[in-house]
Structures are given as structure tokens and as C-alpha cells.
């Protein structure tokens, strides 16, 4: 891990194949991508290198944010890498456009954790300390942590 990275890990109470499905299906992503009470009414995913990754989040306070990224790597059932610095087809996004004011690259990995559980790891790589700090102040650990917990709930299904 580099100095400018944010890292989040969770052990989810769902098998890896179900976590993968929940992470890669737009209909499932809409259920967990934004920390409640925020919502994700829109999600588009072309799950291949160079493919588009688009989400739109809304909140009760009038918050409305959309972001377009680009998938860099997809390893079925194991790993997804995407960046906010690029849009569909590897086209650069403008700084601040779809980047939350700073570009980052996310690496999400899934590993079997035994007993039908999954080790979920998300790394947000930033270009410098200022961008990492901005992301931290936006609530990286709280927000991404809540979303990881929600991902686990969606993957596990109704109890």
C-alpha cells in the first residue's frame, strides 16, 4: 500500500459468488452503493476493460451527485479495478467532472474467508496526499464502510 491510499476491509457473511453478483449487477448495486438514507437511482455498468461505470446518488437533503468512471480490469469473481479519472473508452474525465474534485483508482478484491464468508477489500489510490486527505474528510471510511456492510446484506439476501 502506498502512502496516498485509503484501504477498507470487511468480512461479509455471504459467499464470494453472491458478493460478486451483488457488486457487478446494476440492479443490486442500486441497493447498496450509497449509505442509507441516500439512494442510487441510476447505475450503468459495462463490465469490461474500457467499459463505462456510471452511478447517480441522491439524498434527502437535496444531494445529487453522478459519477462516470472506466473499468480498467475485471477478473470474474475476484477483482474489479476502476477509475474516476477516465470515462468510457479510456477517455479522460475533466478534473472535478465525475471525480468528486479529485481522481482516484479503486481496486476491489474478493477472497473466500471460509464458512460461506467473503473477505472484501477496497483500496482507493490517490495521486497525492491532498487528494487522499480530501477523500478521508468526505468520509471515506464511514461511507465506504457503510456501503460494504450494505453490500454484504444485499449479497446475503433476506434472513
Regions from the PLM with identified roles:
Residues 5-7, 40-42, 64-69, 102-106:
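Short, surface-exposed coil-to-beta transition loops
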Residues 19, 29, 53, 71, ...:
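Hydrophobic pocket/interface hotspot
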Residues 42, 154-159:
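Short, highly charged C-terminal tails/helix-capping segments
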Residues 16-17, 46-48, 72-80, 109-119:
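A short, structured loop/turn motif at beta-sheet edges
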Residues 42-90:
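Glycine-rich portal/gate segments that line the openings of hydrophobic small-molecule binding cavities
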Residues 81-83, 91-142:
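Beta-strand/loop substructures that line and gate deep hydrophobic ligand-binding cavities in soluble
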Residues 1-40:
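Hydrophobic ligand-binding cavity/cleft-lining segments
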Residues 2-4, 47, 61-65, 98-102, ...:
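A generic structural micro-feature
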Amino acid at each position: 500500500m502506498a502512502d496516498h491510499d485509503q484501504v477498507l476491509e470487511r468480512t461479509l457473511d455471504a459467499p464470494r459468488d453472491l458478493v460478486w453478483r451483488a457488486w457487478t449487477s446494476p440492479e443490486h448495486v442500486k441497493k447498496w452503493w450509497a449509505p442509507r438514507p441516500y439512494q442510487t437511482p441510476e447505475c450503468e455498468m459495462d463490465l469490461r476493460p474500457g467499459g463505462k461505470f456510471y452511478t447517480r446518488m441522491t439524498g434527502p437533503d437535496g444531494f445529487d451527485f453522478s459519477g462516470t468512471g472506466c473499468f480498467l480490469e475485471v477478473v470474474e469473481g475476484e477483482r474489479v479495478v476502476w477509475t474516476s479519472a477516465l470515462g468510457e473508452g479510456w477517455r479522460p474525465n475533466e478534473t472535478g467532472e465525475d471525480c468528486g474534485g479529485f481522481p482516484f483508482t479503486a481496486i476491489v478484491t474478493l477472497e473466500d474467508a471460509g464458512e460461506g464468508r467473503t473477505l472484501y477489500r477496497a483500496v482507493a489510490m490517490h495521486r497525492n496526499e491532498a487528494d487522499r486527505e480530501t477523500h478521508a474528510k468526505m468520509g471515506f471510511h464511514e461511507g465506504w464502510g457503510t456501503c460494504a456492510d450494505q453490500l454484504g446484506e444485499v449479497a446475503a439476501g433476506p434472513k
